[in-house]
């Protein structure tokens, strides 16, 4: 009977841990989407900067400044993405361990 109580508690913990894992995955997907948007902005800015159109040439200094900011933001996003990937892995590992412990508690 005591094993059943422990198993129920661990099952609830596993459920919560899986929710945390899904939350971490959602945050990671949002970061990946932002990275793609920044990469698209970088491509657009590079195209405008290398354009021979006189209008774009007038704004070359502004484009260069924007490109610098975009590269900086891109590096920040990459670091954030790596941290979130580690968090997803850590949350998944915790959930797997709790699931194993729950299975062991059921056997008792």
Describe the role of every protein-language-model region.
Residues 1-108:
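Charge-rich amphipathic alpha-helical interaction elements
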